[in-house]
């Protein structure tokens, strides 16, 4: 009889242990649920506070008064003298900074981040250009000059301070299309570990009065913030042509944009970590004001490649391709007299297409010779069309 009682007692004891475990698990799950509900409640409280809080008024700081108060221009209209909230660092309050005022417009509650024009923002190339000097053929002298003027001041400005001279602020690259001006600018940005800001000068020509000058100003401000940086202005003749008094509103706007560019070139220190490189095909039409000392001090010609240069360029492109062993680079260079670097690249691409059409996986010497002939015909046709336009225009 006693044995049956012990069995019943053991069974009830094990049931109690199991029940306790179940209750503990239930408590844990309820605690987790309470924590999740508390987070959700805090989230909705924060959202309610955002919806119920009054909007702030944007203003621009005009001046900081001796007593610590600030003169601002409110977006709602008048200029106001306001106080600064105690949680804001007084050092951040400077003329030109955007701030947020409370609804009454009596106190600065927040310093707003600096605005960037979307047009200016898209000019920055976030990824470093993947171009090196070894990928540029026949321009050793130009590379040497560019490194002295741009790369050396960015990497070792103390050398110029020690010797007591200022390096040139800007470099102007000029020469026929396709000779490697853009590649030179990208290569020096790569080697200098600088932010590369690429802009075509025609982007400065805007529809509304003053917009072009504002974009130029904001471009230079962004370059200073992102320093070390290189601004590359391609086709600068679009805004830098000689000024003539036509009197049209569009011409006046371009002249205002040019004046702003000249002011920016005059306004920064050559030893700041910002360098300007400009490129043009038409140096003959540039305004003399751009070329005067203190602006584009170093003017570098980027000519069509000579025989040795064409050989180097062919070698650079062909070593990346699958070609037969009997390629004669010297002969290719002789046949491509007058070709630019871009023309030679087109020759290599066209030769590859010829091999693909024939079902081959290697480019032959014959493909390259035929490609040179084809590109030459296109160039001659373009030149004859240009002559006809000039004749009948």
From Swiss-Prot:
It is found in: Cytoplasm. Its main location: cytoplasm. GO terms for cellular component: cytoplasm; proteasome-activating nucleotidase complex. One of its GO terms (molecular function) is ATP binding. Belongs to the AAA ATPase family. Consists of three main regions, an N-terminal coiled-coil domain that may assist in substrate recognition, an interdomain involved in PAN hexamerization, and a C-terminal ATPase domain of the AAA type. ATPase which is responsible for recognizing, binding, unfolding and translocation of substrate proteins into the archaeal 20S proteasome core particle. Is essential for opening the gate of the 20S proteasome via an interaction with its C-terminus, thereby allowing substrate entry and access to the site of proteolysis. Thus, the C-termini of the proteasomal ATPase function like a 'key in a lock' to induce gate opening and therefore regulate proteolysis. Homohexamer. The hexameric complex has a two-ring architecture resembling a top hat that caps the 20S proteasome core at one or both ends. Upon ATP-binding, the C-terminus of PAN interacts with the alpha-rings of the proteasome core by binding to the intersubunit pockets. This is Proteasome-activating nucleotidase. It comes from Saccharolobus islandicus (strain Y.N.15.51 / Yellowstone #2) (Sulfolobus islandicus). The gene is pan.
């Amino acid at each position: 009889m006693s044995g049956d009682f012990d069995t019943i007692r053991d069974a009830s004891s094990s049931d109690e242990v199991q029940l306790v475990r179940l209750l503990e698990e239930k408590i844990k799950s309820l605690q987790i649920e309470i924590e999740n509900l508390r987070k959700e409640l805090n989230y909705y409280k924060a959202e309610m506070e955002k919806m119920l809080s009054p909007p702030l008024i944007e203003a621009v700081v005009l001046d900081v008064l001796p007593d610590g108060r600030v003169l601002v221009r409110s977006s709602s209209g008048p200029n106001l003298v306001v106080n600064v909230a105690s949680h804001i660092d007084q050092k951040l309050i400077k003329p030109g900074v955007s701030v947020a005022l409370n609804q009454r417009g009596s106190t600065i509650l927040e310093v707003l981040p600096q605005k960037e024009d979307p047009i200016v923002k898209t000019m920055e190339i976030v990824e470093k250009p993947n171009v090196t000097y070894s990928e540029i053929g026949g321009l050793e002298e130009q590379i040497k000059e560019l490194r002295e003027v741009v790369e050396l001041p960015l990497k070792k400005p103390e050398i110029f301070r020690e010797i007591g001279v200022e390096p040139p602020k800007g470099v102007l690259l000029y020469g026929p299309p396709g000779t490697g001006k853009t590649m030179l600018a990208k290569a020096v940005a790569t080697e200098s570990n600088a932010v590369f800001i690429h802009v075509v000068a025609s982007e400065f020509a805007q529809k509304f009065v003053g917009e072009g000058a504002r974009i130029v100003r904001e471009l230079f401000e962004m370059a200073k913030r992102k320093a070390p940086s290189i601004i590359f202005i391609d086709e600068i003749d679009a805004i830098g042509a000689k000024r003539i008094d036509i009197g049209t509103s569009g011409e006046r706007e371009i002249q205002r944009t040019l004046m702003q560019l000249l002011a920016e070139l005059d306004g920064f220190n050559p030893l700041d970590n910002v360098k300007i490189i400009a490129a043009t095909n038409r140096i003959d039409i540039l305004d003399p004001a751009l070329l005067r000392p203190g602006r584009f001090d170093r003017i570098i010609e980027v000519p069509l490649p000579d025989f040795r240069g064409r050989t180097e360029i062919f070698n650079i492109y062909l070593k990346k391709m699958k070609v037969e062993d009997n390629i004669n680079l010297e002969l290719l260079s002789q046949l491509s007299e007058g070709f630019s670097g871009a023309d030679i690249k087109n020759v290599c691409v066209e030769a590859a297409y010829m091999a693909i059409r024939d079902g081959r996986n290697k480019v032959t010497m014959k493909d390259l010779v035929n490609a040179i002939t084809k590109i030459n015909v296109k160039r001659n046709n373009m030149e004859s069309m240009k002559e006809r336009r000039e004749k009948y225009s």
